[in-house]
């Protein structure tokens, strides 16, 4: 898998700055305020840095943005990057500043002169996240950034703060790698194998095969994958880092490794992006990896239904009726509304087996949520106000966009079927809401539940402050924060 770039922390050495090759990064706040190390660079550059910080171009920069000064006189470095950042900044701005650095690391090495910036660990986290580069399928010489060193006033303290963030970066990168992989590489077999390998980190991993799910009555999930040559699987990952009597939190993910739409086949244009339809399962996997790597003091179980939705002579048809593990029957109106069928059985299994304190499911579930919220926010649905508020607070603190969507009985009535207990698709109107109501039917009344529709946030066509175009890893940060707040305090 792709690993974050390692970052070393050391005390400031002003005499070493002039001879440092590669790229030098310095910070200046509003009005051009600079620390000791930046002032040293300014002297070496004969005032050029101060003039840049006083320029109109620098004045127009927002906090966390940067400008370049190429081939600085008086220094061995190839370039100096001037980042606009106040010494006392918030977490999101510090990460954004790190992202500006991470997008342009030098092959010859990068020296970050953080001085006394209070959020230096968050800056390093932003560097790591933005430096992500998915290259396993590219041939030829690959550009590998040189060593990254951060000179900071209190290196031991910053290194200790950055430790858990390194585990988070590993989890986010694992999620991004899974979502970015093509379906001919990430089959249901390979996905399950990658998750099983995490037992080396201390996770308990169990794989349920099709015959196991058949015995449990999971015909909703199994029907989705019956047109594929690759068998469906249910992977259960348990992290038991909390007290024995702590009731676990359950995370449930949709893992459709490729979605053609089945017999209700999708248009060809854009179908290549349906390799990301396992994004919910990838986030669950990334969170579980993070918990194991940082030795979280919490009990969490992650469950992912892994299937491939393909059309062939054995594929599920529009009009079929399937029986879920719960016992409810479902009329399949549209085979391209398959994710909710997968989640229905996994949600019920999670509650029956683990009786969790709460369940959070994640899925690239509907295009309707993109129409409603674009690519800035994940749609949040819940049956429990307090649980939902805790999640929204966690998402806001981590800078991940999330917006609560409405639910109501009139939407639930739209699921009525003429021949079964419910139907899996209701048409275009309120598509993300009716999908959430479908899932809610497989949540016990006493179970706090959150549904996260990440169709608009799991993969993006353009760069962001903390990720290149492609998979974002949205959700790992928010869920890890929620687990810290709920289970580890």
Swiss-Prot record:
Keywords from the named record: Aminopeptidase, Cytoplasm, Hydrolase, Manganese, Metal-binding, Protease
Q: Which CDD domains match?
A: Peptidase_M17
Residues that coordinate or bind Mn(2+) 2: 254, 259, 277, 338
What Enzyme Commission number(s) does the record list for this chain? 3.4.11.1, 3.4.11.10
Q: Which reaction does it catalyse?
A: Release of an N-terminal amino acid, Xaa-|-Yaa-, in which Xaa is preferably Leu, but may be other amino acids including Pro although not Arg or Lys, and Yaa may be Pro. Amino acid amides and methyl esters are also readily hydrolyzed, but rates on arylamides are exceedingly low; Release of an N-terminal amino acid, preferentially leucine, but not glutamic or aspartic acids
Primary localization class, coarse: cytoplasm
Which cofactor is recorded for it? Answer: Mn(2+)
Q: Which molecular-function annotation in GO is an example for this chain?
A: metalloaminopeptidase activity
Q: Does the keyword Manganese apply?
A: yes
Show the active-site residues.
266, 340
**GO cellular component terms listed in the entry, alphabetical order:** cytoplasm
Record GO biological process:
proteolysis
The chain's disulfide connectivity reads none
What remark does the entry make about the cofactor?
Binds 2 manganese ions per subunit.
Q: Which family does it belong to?
A: Belongs to the peptidase M17 family.
* NCBIfam families recorded: PRK00913.2-2, PRK00913.2-4
Full protein name = Probable cytosol aminopeptidase
């Amino acid at each position: 898998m792709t690993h974050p770039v390692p970052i070393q922390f050391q005390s400031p050495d002003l005499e070493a700055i002039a001879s440092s090759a590669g790229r030098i990064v310095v910070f200046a706040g509003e009005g051009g305020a600079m620390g000791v190390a930046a002032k040293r660079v300014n002297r070496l550059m004969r005032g050029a840095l101060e003039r840049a910080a006083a320029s109109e171009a620098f004045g127009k920069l927002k906090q966390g943005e940067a400008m370049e000064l190429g081939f600085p006189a008086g220094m061995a470095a190839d370039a100096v990057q001037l980042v606009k950042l106040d010494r006392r900044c918030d977490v999101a701005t510090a990460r954004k500043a790190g992202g500006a650095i991470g997008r342009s690391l030098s092959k010859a090495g990068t020296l970050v002169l953080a001085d006394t910036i209070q959020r230096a660990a968050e800056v390093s986290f932003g560097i790591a996240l933005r430096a992500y580069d998915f290259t396993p399928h590219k041939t030829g010489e690959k550009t590998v950034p040189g060593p990254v060193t951060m000179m900071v006033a209190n290196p031991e303290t910053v290194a200790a703060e950055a430790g858990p963030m390194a585990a988070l970066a590993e989890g986010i990168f694992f999620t991004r790698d899974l979502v970015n992989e093509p379906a001919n590489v990430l089959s249901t077999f390979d996905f399950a194998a990658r998750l099983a390998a995490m037992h080396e980190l201390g996770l308990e991993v169990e794989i349920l095969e099709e015959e196991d799910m058949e015995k449990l009555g999971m015909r909703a999930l199994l029907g989705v994958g019956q047109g594929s040559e690759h068998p469906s699987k249910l992977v259960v990952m348990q992290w038991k880092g909390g007290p024995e009597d702590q009731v676990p939190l359950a995370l449930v993910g949709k893992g459709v490794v490729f979605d053609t739409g089945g017999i209700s086949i999708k248009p060809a244009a854009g179908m290549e992006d349906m390799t990301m339809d396992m994004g919910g399962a990838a986030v669950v996997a990334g969170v579980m990896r993070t918990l194991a790597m940082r030795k979280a003091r919490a009990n969490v179980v992650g469950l992912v239904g892994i299937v491939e939705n393909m059309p062939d002579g054995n594929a599920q048809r529009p009009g079929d009726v399937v029986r879920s593990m719960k016992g409810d029957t479902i009329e399949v109106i549209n085979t391209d509304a398959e994710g909710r069928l997968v989640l229905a059985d996994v949600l019920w299994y999670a509650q029956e087996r683990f009786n969790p304190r709460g369940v959070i499911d994640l899925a690239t579930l509907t295009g309707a949520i993109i129409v409603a919220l674009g690519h800035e926010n994940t749609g949040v649905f819940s049956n429990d106000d307090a649980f939902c508020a805790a999640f929204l607070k966690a998402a806001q603190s981590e800078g991940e966009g999330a917006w609560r969507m409405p639910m109501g009985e009139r939407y639930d009535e739209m699921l009525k079927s003429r021949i079964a207990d419910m139907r899996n698709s209701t048409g275009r109107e309120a598509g993300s809401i009716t999908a959430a109501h479908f899932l809610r039917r497989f949540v016990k009344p006493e179970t706090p539940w959150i549904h996260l529709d990440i169709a608009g946030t799991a993969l993006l066509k353009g760069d962001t402050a903390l990720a290149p175009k492609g998979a974002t890893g949205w959700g790992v940060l928010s869920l890890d924060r929620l687990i810290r707040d709920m289970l580890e305090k």
